[in-house]
Swiss-Prot record:
Protein keywords: Calcium, Metal-binding, Repeat
Protein name: Copine-4
Tissue expr: Widely expressed. Expressed strongly in the brain, heart and prostate. Expressed strongly in peripheral blood leukocytes.
Signal peptide residues on this chain, from the entry's feature table: none
InterPro entries: C2_dom (IPR000008), C2_domain_sf (IPR035892), C2B_Copine (IPR037768), Copine (IPR045052), Copine_C (IPR010734), VWF_A (IPR002035), vWFA_dom_sf (IPR036465)
Residues binding Ca(2+) 1, per UniProt: D170, D176, D232, D234
Organism the protein comes from: Homo sapiens
Gene Ontology annotations of biological process type: cellular response to calcium ion
Subunit annotation: Interacts (via VWFA domain) with ACTB, BCOR, BICD2, CCDC22, CDC42BPB, CEP162, MYCBP2, NONO, PDCD6, PITPNM2, RDX, SKIL, SKT, SPTBN1, UBE2O and WTAP.
Length: 557
């Protein structure tokens, strides 16, 4: 057991923090309860210091205000941190007694601490733990941390315009009008936001409704000026100017109340020259509807669980596990590539699964007692309950099953994709964002059931499910790249395309000289968008109710 633990820790300890485009920012609110002071005759002046681990070292991120003589402090200062789903972000909250005459830290001032990951906080939304001091509980003191997404504006707005009595610019027919909307930038430049279709031969056109992100429309500022221009289309590209007007998103939102918002379309030249000029027509906004675009953290904080499943290749091409050249060879202290990949990805996913029970399967081996070939057997040999307790449990089940198997073949992965897809399909019956499935497949060779696998992936693309494939060893994986839709659209043998890209494939050798965290970062970076794409595409909102949200904001530990 000691060797297993060493292998697990060896793989896990290399996980670090990387700089990459931030998915989102999270605000952390902190409160403590029952803080005990070293001096029983007085109350402490507590301050909470947030530290983050990078490359094995802890560094201070920020600290709260000091609350004088208080054993149950609720801090107003918020911690703002960048959130990366694909990384293990280790945090330490330290409570110190800061006396009024100094702001430094002494060992005697330390009242207790708590370590966790940012993933644990956001998945539970409200995390309460006992404070520890030198490995022991610090009396009855505890700390509570609440996470809240500091979101940008990713909402979309749907707009529909029509016009009345536009100027006629054509001699032998009526104008062919279209509308352009420009955002006025801070540097006095203007950015085209949308161009409508052309409505032919019509002075009172009704343009089709369109959607545009609020960020694109006004950079999130409802008071930003918008310039709208109406043109008469000409086939030679020299469109005739009809008129223009300016507005703001704030003004346009008046149409959300069922009212029409309208503007006079003005031609400045006509207005300057013609004494009785009124306008060149009227433009009416008859629809303004905001579509909420929920984020990954909206779903996670709303209670969506990540159901992590692992499938391991036990085909003969891996080599005899008793031989040190085998990809399945168990070194006493150095994890093999299968274990490195498993721990790197599993360490992250486990924070988003409340029960920490992970189904683990094998494929391509003859299994006891009859030693028939199976492509979806439980590596704990309990087909009724293939779940293992934590990533450590998966590691132990993997090492325990190796001597009992006969490595064989072929390398078929469609059965395991279909097995997980069946569970994901049952989840769709709830019509809720309750569970999203991630299947990690670890394989040493090119799969032999490509047609069936393509069919299974196309089917799975309609389900709350993502597939991560890591190729271990030195095989030629060029044919595997076709499963990853980055270079084109994957299709079933019958020609049906995937509904969305759900597969990520990487060869482990690309990360051989990097830490396993780099592998996890590569294969998991797309998962948040895949989760959002699925639920937004289905019109499924986060499960969290307003009552649950309000209760999570309560800081009483």
């Amino acid at each position: 057991m000691k060797k297993m633990s060493n292998i697990y820790e060896s793989a896990a300890n290399t996980l670090g923090i990387f700089n990459s485009p931030c998915l989102t920012k999270v605000e952390l609110r902190v409160a403590c309860k029952g803080i005990s002071d070293r001096d029983a005759l007085s109350k402490p002046d507590p301050c909470v210091i947030l530290k983050m681990q990078s490359h094995g070292q802890w560094f201070e991120v920020d600290r709260t205000e000091v609350i004088r003589t208080c054993i149950n402090p609720v801090y107003s200062k918020l911690f703002t941190v960048d959130f990366y789903f694909e990384e293990v972000q280790r945090l330490r909250f330290e409570v110190h007694d800061i006396s009024s005459n100094h702001n430094g830290l002494k060992e005697a001032d330390f009242l207790g601490g708590m370590e966790c990951t940012l993933g644990q906080i956001v998945s539970q939304r409200k995390l309460s733990k006992s404070l520890l001091k030198h490995g022991n509980t610090a009396g009855k003191s505890s700390i509570t941390v609440i996470a809240e997404e500091l979101s940008g504006n990713d909402d979309y707005v749907e707009l529909a315009f029509n016009a009345r009595k536009l100027d006629d610019k054509d001699f032998f027919s009526k104008s062919d009008p279209f509308l352009e909307i420009f955002r006025m930038n801070d540097d006095a430049t203007q950015q085209l936001v949308h161009r409508t279709e052309v409505v032919m031969n019509n002075l009172s056109p009704a343009w089709k409704s369109f959607k545009v992100s609020v960020n694109s429309l006004c950079s999130g500022d409802p008071d930003r000026r918008l310039k709208c221009i109406v043109w008469d289309w000409d086939s030679n590209g020299k469109h005739d100017f009809i008129g223009e007007f300016t507005s703001t998103f704030k003004e346009m939102r008046g149409a959300m109340e069922g009212k029409q918002v309208q503007w006079e379309c003005i031609n400045p030249k006509y207005k300057a020259k013609k004494k009785n000029y009124k306008n060149s027509g009227t433009v009416i906004l008859n629809l303004c509807k905001i579509h909420k675009m929920h984020s990954f953290l909206d779903y996670i904080m709303g209670g969506c669980q990540i159901q992590f499943t692992v499938a391991i290749d036990f085909t003969a091409s891996n080599g005899d596990p008793r031989n040190s050249c085998s990809l399945h060879y168990i070194h006493p202290y150095q994890p093999n590539e299968y274990l490195k990949a498993l721990v790197a990805v599993g360490e992250i996913c486990q924070d988003y699964d409340s029960d920490k029970m992970f189904p683990a399967f094998g494929f391509g081996a003859r299994i006891p007692p009859e030693y028939t070939v199976s492509h979806d057997f439980a590596i704990n040999f309990n087909e009724d309950n293939p779940e293992c307790a934590g990533i450590q449990g998966v590691v132990e089940a993997y090492q325990s099953c190796l001597p009992k198997l006969q490595l064989y073949g072929p390398t078929n992965i469609a059965p395991i994709i279909q097995k997980v897809a069946k569970s994901a399909s049952e989840e769709t019956n709830t019509k809720e964002a309750s569970q999203y499935f991630i299947l990690l497949i670890l394989t040493d060779g090119v799969i032999t059931d490509m047609a069936d696998t393509r069919e299974a992936i196309v089917h799975a693309s309609h389900l709350p499910m993502s597939v991560i494939i890591v190729g271990v060893g030195n095989a030629d994986f060029s044919d595997m790249q076709m499963l990853d839709g980055d270079d084109g659209i994957l299709r079933s043998p019958k020609g049906e395309p995937v509904l969305r890209d759900i597969v990520q494939f990487v060869p482990f050798r690309n990360f051989k000289h990097a830490s396993p965290a780099a592998l996890a970062k590569s294969v998991l970076a797309e998962v948040p968008n895949q989760v959002v794409d699925y639920y937004n595409g289905k019109g499924i909102k986060p499960k969290c109710s307003s009552e649950m949200y309000e209760s999570s904001r309560t800081l009483a530990p």
